[in-house]
Regions:
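Class I S-adenosyl-L-methionine-dependent methyltransferase catalytic core
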Residues: 4, 9, 13, 21-23, ...
Length: 384
């Protein structure tokens, strides 16, 4: 059953009595998939999801990063992690299961809208994955939010239809709120697309929670001073898919010359680069070493003006026969095999943290941010 804060009323498919949603098709007990879709008045064919909460972004950071992830993007990544979900509680702490076109919840009011595709993915695959529970929360800018749960009814012998439970929150649903932190303690795995503008807070929270997680982000988030140490210590790494992803964007977004399109339905789309998945769940890809063939020579691999390390502009050209520290593009993180290379630092501003070694400059010319790596077979001398 679904707890809700609405006045008692009667509808064709369900009864709202004493603030309880009772579904007619399930003997006034459980909300089924299709009644749930009608209850939310959502367009189930819509292939989008909010990549970070727009209200939170716009009201707290002043940034415009309201994007909607395609369901196919979620499916392409999560198919590699199915073994992790059996019997687990999954928490999507930046996902609204029913968000209207104007950005506000239209739970049962007939206003139309669409649903979070992270919620949608786990709703559609709840029994296939063998989930124990799904919890979703999201931020509301000007009013209390709610949590929505799908709860397994399996008794070990017979598979039952899951219950759908909607419960008002006292607070706004911010992932840092006491209510959401308590839900984080309850869960086993977090899967979501968090607010990109708050990744300096979000990723450390996930890592220090001790929970497993799989979240969308940008590769450059790894080089934030608040986050980099966790990549260096192999407490987080990149998932399977990365690169340029298309996201649906609101109508008020301005058209751009590149990485922008409008489809046949008039929907605007933006393509974002360096998008990736961050996770602490071990995957086979992570242990596949790079196939390298280049050998070191000082002409092809110049030393930085600012630090005793060499520049390598392409991950495929990392030399195989040097013990020196090598500066490589951030895209290396998508190919990092911890048995092959250790991450020793980063070359960015030279002052962001103890691991920010120097500004990457070669022959007086600055390079883009680099990850500092070294072969794992490096033998330290007595002077090091």
């Amino acid at each position: 059953m679904v707890t809700a804060c609405f006045k008692p009323t009667v509808h064709n498919n369900f009864i709202i009595k004493d603030n309880i949603f009772l579904c007619k098709q399930a003997g006034y007990k459980t909300l089924l998939m299709e009644p749930l879709n009608r209850l939310f008045n959502k367009h189930v064919e819509g292939d989008m999801d909010m990549a970070g909460n727009s209200n939170l972004h716009m009201s707290r950071s002043g940034k415009t990063d309201e994007f909607y992830t395609q369901l196919s993007t979620i499916e392409d990544e999560l198919r590699h992690y199915r073994k992790y979900f059996k019997g687990k509680v999954v928490f999507c702490n930046a996902d609204d299961p029913a968000i209207g076109e104007d950005g506000y919840d239209h739970f049962g009011d007939g206003a139309g809208g669409y649903t979070s595709n992270f919620f949608r993915y786990f709703q559609l695959n709840f029994q296939q994955l063998g989930l124990k529970k799904l919890i979703t929360t999201h931020y509301e800018a000007n009013r209390p939010s709610y949590k929505f749960e799908i709860v397994s009814n399996d008794d070990g012998e017979q598979i039952g239809l899951p219950d759908y439970v909607r419960t008002p929150l006292e607070g706004d649903g911010d992932f840092r709120s006491p209510e959401c932190l308590a839900l984080l303690e309850e869960c086993d795995i977090v899967v979501t697309n968090p607010p990109f503008s708050l990744m300096k807070e979000y990723l450390p929270l996930m890592i220090n929670s001790g929970k497993q997680f799989l979240i969308l982000g940008n590769m450059n988030h790894a080089l934030f001073a608040e986050n980099f140490v966790y990549f260096k210590e192999n407490r987080v790494w990149l998932g399977y898919n990365n690169g340029h992803f298309w996201f649906r964007v609101p109508d008020h977004y301005e058209a751009k010359q590149t990485d922008f399109k409008i489809d046949e339905n008039g929907q605007k789309w933006r393509r974002m680069g360096n998008i990736c998945w961050f996770t602490n769940m071990d995957i086979e890809k992570r242990h596949q070493p790079l196939d390298l063939y280049r050998t070191y020579n000082p002409d092809d691999y110049p030393t930085y003006d600012t630090y005793d390390a060499i520049e390598c502009g392409r991950c495929s050209e990392i030399p195989i026969d040097t013990d020196r520290i090598i500066g490589v593009p951030v895209t290396f993180l998508a190919q990092h095999c911890p048995e092959q290379f250790e991450i020793v630092g980063e070359f960015k501003h030279g002052c962001d943290s103890e691991f920010d070694l120097a500004v990457p400059i070669v022959n007086g010319k600055s390079k883009y941010m680099r990850v500092a790596i070294r072969h794992c077979n490096h033998v330290k001398t007595g002077d090091e």
